[in-house]
Amino acid sequence: MSIYFSGLMAPLDKNNVDTDQIIPKQFLTSTSREGFDAALFYDWRYLENDEPNPDFILNRPCYQGAQILLTRDNFGCGSSREHAPWALKQYGFEVILAESFADIFFNNCGNNQMLAIALPGDTLEQLFVLSEQHDDIHIDIDLENQTLTSTKFAPISFDIRKDVKERLLSGLDFIGVTETLNPQIDAFEQQLAAERPWQ
């Protein structure tokens, strides 16, 4: 088995988590991709006095350092903001497990080297039940063979688009993928110039 990633899973038992809940709009003041981790889930993580909310799941000591987020349906819905995956990744999340993702958010995850895995609702429900019984669920992710494994559950298979999988395995974003095609692009331009010298 080829392990792409291993990490601790933290459960966020909420449907329809939109990008404004992931990172509220008042924190969208920079395009540097840095410093957004403190604002992640701000309205849930903090009380009115900016003290950590002890009732919020990610503030529990057992989930400090979690790198896999388990959540529900339609994660990342709402307005398009790449700051949302930036905040998640800077906080430490590398993988998100959900029943479905908003399309733009899903693509932004891939562009930022985050693995977003859509799982059937019954599979997610089993993982949430397990998370109520155990707060130390570590998952090994074999991206090549598209499986999740753990000492707490039987192997789980998942689907992923081929282009997303290849980009994650290669570590390339869209620009990097385009640069790998430079020889073909150069050859096409030379051929076009020869066939249409008037252009």
Curated annotation (Swiss-Prot):
- One Pfam family per UniProt: Aconitase_C
User: Record's Gene3D superfamilies?
Assistant: Aconitase, domain 4 (3.20.19.10)
- First-tier enzyme category under EC: lyase
Cross-referenced InterPro entries: 3-IsopropMal_deHydase_ssu (IPR004431), Aconitase/3IPM_dehydase_swvl (IPR015928), AconitaseA/IPMdHydase_ssu_swvl (IPR000573), IPMI_Swivel (IPR033940), LeuD (IPR050075)
Keywords recorded for this protein, A-Z: Amino-acid biosynthesis, Branched-chain amino acid biosynthesis, Leucine biosynthesis, Lyase
Q: Name one GO cellular component term.
A: 3-isopropylmalate dehydratase complex
Report which reactions are catalysed by this protein: (2R,3S)-3-isopropylmalate = (2S)-2-isopropylmalate
Q: Give a GO molecular function annotation for the protein.
A: 3-isopropylmalate dehydratase activity
Q: What pathway, per the record?
A: Amino-acid biosynthesis; L-leucine biosynthesis; L-leucine from 3-methyl-2-oxobutanoate: step 2/4
A GO biological process this protein is involved in?
Answer: L-leucine biosynthetic process
Enzyme Commission number:
4.2.1.33
Function of the protein: Catalyzes the isomerization between 2-isopropylmalate and 3-isopropylmalate, via the formation of 2-isopropylmaleate.
Q: Which family does it belong to?
A: Belongs to the LeuD family. LeuD type 1 subfamily.
* Record's subunit section: Heterodimer of LeuC and LeuD.
Name of the protein in question: 3-isopropylmalate dehydratase small subunit
- Annotated organism of origin: Pseudoalteromonas translucida (strain TAC 125)
What is the gene name? leuD
